[in-house]
Amino acid sequence: MRIQVINPNTSEAMTHKIGLAAQAIARPGTQILACSPDDGPLSIEGHFDEAIATLGVLEEIRKGREQQVDAHIIACFGDPGLLAAREYASAPVIGIAEAAFHMASLISTRFAVVTTLTRTRIIAEHLLQRYGLSELCTSVRCIDLPVLALEESGPELIECMAEQARRARDDEGAGAIVLGCGGMADLGRQLSEAIGLPVIDGVAAAVKLAESLVDLGLTTSKHGDLADPIGKPFKGRFAYLSR
């Protein structure tokens, strides 16, 4: 089985980290193909970044189709371009936020999210609403740290995340914590040990869900809005998409 893991930003260090985390959780025989776009933002921290990154995600999906991968994962917590990617791809496409939310709902009646910048809280809340899981999330908590700062993780970072997670646990009754950034993919075990709660990393959750969908022979339904894109002419830099 070959799973394409797309880091939608252009940080090579983060792509490497995400790829290692994905391969570590994958079962024997599953090959992880970690990649990122050639063009786009170095980190994704808002709607503008997501809009630009979506074009890169779709280009990587195109490459994955040519490589005939068995599944695609979008490894950014905003799930940028997820529905467009499902429309474009023939193999299953999983976003790490959606994967993490659903995984958390299976092991706890209430969960909280610990993410990076405060401005991304609303984006996470919008995703929870879209996926129908808002009522299960006690809060989206932020550590006010830029995404790229996660590349230099240490004890201070874990303690900062643990402080927010403990508040969600003690004040709100959260029974599980969702990591709100693909760049946190290597921090789940340390945080879980620090707070005594299950911690769900979306990259790991997405890999296991992708393996399960492939095993079950399931992929995106092409009935309705996720049917293949309607053929039409494209101009300029997108002319290659014409059909």
Positions of PLM-derived features:
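Periplasmic-binding protein-like
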Residues: V5, E66-C76, G173-C181
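N-terminal beta-loop-helix "entrance" segment that forms/cooperates
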Residues: L33-L58, L148-S153
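Short, acidic/small-residue loops that bind anionic groups at enzyme active sites
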Residues: R86-S108, Q190-V207
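Short, flexible loop segments at boundaries between secondary-structure elements
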Residues: L145, I200-T219
